Amino acid sequence: MDTRRTLLLALCIIPLMIQFVPITNASLAQTDGNRDYWPTNEWLVSPPEDHGLNSGILNQIDTSITENNIQINSVIVVSDGYIVYEKYYHAWTQYMAHTIQSCTKSFMSALIGIAIDEGYIDNVSQRVLDFFPNYTIDNWDPRKENITIERLLTMSSGLEWHEVDIPYSDPLNDLFAMYRSSNMWQYVLNRPMEYDPGAHWSYNSGGIELLAGIIEQATGYSIVDFAKEFLFDPIGIDYFSWWYVPASGQYGCSGGLNLRPRDMARFGYLYLNGGTWNDTQVISSEWVNVSTQMYYDTGSWHHYGYTWWGVPGYTFYEATGHYEQKIYVLPEEDIVVVFTGNIPDEDWHPTDYFVMEYVINAKLEGGRLDNLLIINLSLLLVIVLPIPAIAIRRRYS
């Protein structure tokens, strides 16, 4: 093989070698925040294939929902900052606000991070009782003095709390007993201790209501006004409602937020970009990182961070709400996925499966399709390009 053919063959093989060097957008998506546009005013829509996703695989989400009559009300997939897949069911539309249930908890986590960034709160090691100096606490236990903000964020306060272990209709269910109380924060602080703080994970919506109280006590804002000024307005969430609990005159911050699905996606996209939005650091990247780490094994399939959930063996994390409200953030794939729904507790909850089986595989298969195209093109060049070289050699030989 002469020099010309060797050079041409090398030029054809090099693209193949480069193509198989593992490259990920995860670090870029979480740190630099460099985007060609920001969906503050409007999301742009683009075909999945333009962002390396296989539309045939994505469409299996719709097939599964419709053929099995799954009570999903909306699905959004955002890739590279563009909506590449969006479906609505059961008369829901993109313009309608939907209950997000306990996804509200992840918004509360973000607001705690912002309150720390803004200097209203020192850090997550601050003691909870320091924010309620005028409260008289029932069932006093010195261990209550050791409950910190971090213990509330990770649901490891040690307070005795019965929410998911007994029916919601049971008068002893603490969630609804709290909603019936004249002061939700007082109700939670009055609960007896069951474990040392940090020793045990137990699902506790009451701790999230205390986080709202901490923000209001520390900032002087109502939780709604604080969220609007420091979180919603900067990322373009201009339509929302928040459940006002009549008995206490307080806002339900463990599950009372209502948002449009596209605004849920904005929140996920903020986290995907490391807290940055259009050159503004809305939440510190440090908070995004620390709050989405997993600190507790919940005893089920999921692990738990600062109100965010994770699945062992996967790099995505999710905000989760009752009846299948979900916000998934997939840093490695540069993707956000949103679901709203009305799935009863006793039914199959399919959204984790949809993300793992369809969304991630759509990205993987889209990438494989790109590889095949490059391989085929490169092989074509290997075959075709040497021909002129051979002709040139013969002409001047």
Specify the residue positions occupied by each region the protein language model found.
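Secretory targeting signatures
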Residues: M1-T31, G366-S397
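A short, well-structured edge-of-sheet supersecondary motif
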Residues: D62-W92, I327, D334-V338
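Active-site SXXK
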Residues: G81, H98-V124, L152, L211-I215, ...
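Short, charged, amphipathic alpha-helices and their helix-cap/turn boundaries
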Residues: Y82-K87, L129-D130, I166-P197, Y221-F240
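Active-site helix/loop module of the DD-peptidase/beta-lactamase fold
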Residues: E118-L159, N190, A218-S254, L259
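Active-site-proximal alpha-helical segments within enzyme catalytic domains
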Residues: G207-I214, G255-T276, Q325-G341
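Active-site Gly/Thr loop motif
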Residues: D238, V288-V336
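Structured C-terminal helix/loop/strand segments within mature extracytoplasmic catalytic/sensor domains
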Residues: F316, G321-G367
